[in-house]
């Protein structure tokens, strides 16, 4: 079977907080694959998925459900049961990478820089009372802090706390998305994202993308609203810094056991250090997303999508 005759089923949408982004990602990938001569179809992640797989009989499945069950290994576990090759990490590795505290602990143990953090479950607040918990942890905290859900993406539920008053409201917001939250030391610097793809010869780091916003806060609106952010591709880095951050991204991709593609996010501080923030097993593919921008800087997003599908199809 030639590469161009491959049938690709793209799973997007679902009942997650990132549904809209997922649907837009799915449509863009489908268009890119069609441009390359593939038969591509987008289906919603709902109760009709099993029949869609049976009817379309894809050679490859590309899951693009962002957040929660789309990236925590749940969807990947279902796809394992189909016996059809799918794009992305295995269930165990997706689960590992999607849990930010666990991923940070593993990366930190390998000697790579990552900001200090603590992770807290909502159950702790219910049992001890929010005021008591915050009183116990505040003495050991240094503000400002970044408060975020322990899993999920698109910066949903993420905010910066400059003092104890901010911390309380920030945690309420984060807990509205996830039952576990992470308090992370704020590192001033530039947002740098490095996308990684697996090829025959091993992982390849695409050109780093730098994101600049007016208020320095790369939140949901800044990520998915045109003109809210300024992008530099490649990032404004020296040759040595470029090599360092790409090498770190590949190291993290391999350390977490990620497969096919990933996006590794860093903060570059004023001293030239790169601080690992998180790893994305199903990066956004919208017009303002970082993976497509890196792919276009390499050559062609359409061609990158095609190469990923062809690589995955070999696992059949």
Region locations from a protein language model:
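Conserved hydrophobic "DFG−1" position in protein kinase catalytic cores
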Residues: 10, 196, 266-268
């Amino acid at each position: 079977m030639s590469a161009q005759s491959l049938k690709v089923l793209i799973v997007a949408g679902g009942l997650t907080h990132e549904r809209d982004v997922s649907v837009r990602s799915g449509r863009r990938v489908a268009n890119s694959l069609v441009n390359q001569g593939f038969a591509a179809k987008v289906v919603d992640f709902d109760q009709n998925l099993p029949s869609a797989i049976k009817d379309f009989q894809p050679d490859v499945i590309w899951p693009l459900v962002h957040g929660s069950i789309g990236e925590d290994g749940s969807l990947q576990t279902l796809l394992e049961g189909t016996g059809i090759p799918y794009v992305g990490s295995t269930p165990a590795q997706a689960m590992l990478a999607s849990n930010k505290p666990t991923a940070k602990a593993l990366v930190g143990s390998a000697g790579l820089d990552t900001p200090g953090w603590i992770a807290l479950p909502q159950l702790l607040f219910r049992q001890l009372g929010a005021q008591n918990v915050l009183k116990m942890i505040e003495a050991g905290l240094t503000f400002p802090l970044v408060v975020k859900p322990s899993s999920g993406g698109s910066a949903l539920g993420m905010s910066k706390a400059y003092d104890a008053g901010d911390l309380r409201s920030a945690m309420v917001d984060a807990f509205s998305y996830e039952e576990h939250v992470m308090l992370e030391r704020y590192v001033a610097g530039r947002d740098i994202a490095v996308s990684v793809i697996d090829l025959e010869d091993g992982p390849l780091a695409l050109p780093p993308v730098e994101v600049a916003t007016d208020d320095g806060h790369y939140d949901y609106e800044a990520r998915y609203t045109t003109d809210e952010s300024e992008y530099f591709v490649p990032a404004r880095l020296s040759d040595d810094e470029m090599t360092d951050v790409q090498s770190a991204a590949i190291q993290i991709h391999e350390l977490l056991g990620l497969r096919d593609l990933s996006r590794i996010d860093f903060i570059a501080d004023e001293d030239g250090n790169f601080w690992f923030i998180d790893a994305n097993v199903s990066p956004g593919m919208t017009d303002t997303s970082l993976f497509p921008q890196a792919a276009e800087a390499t050559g062609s997003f359409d061609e990158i999508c095609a190469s990923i599908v062809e690589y995955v199809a070999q696992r059949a």
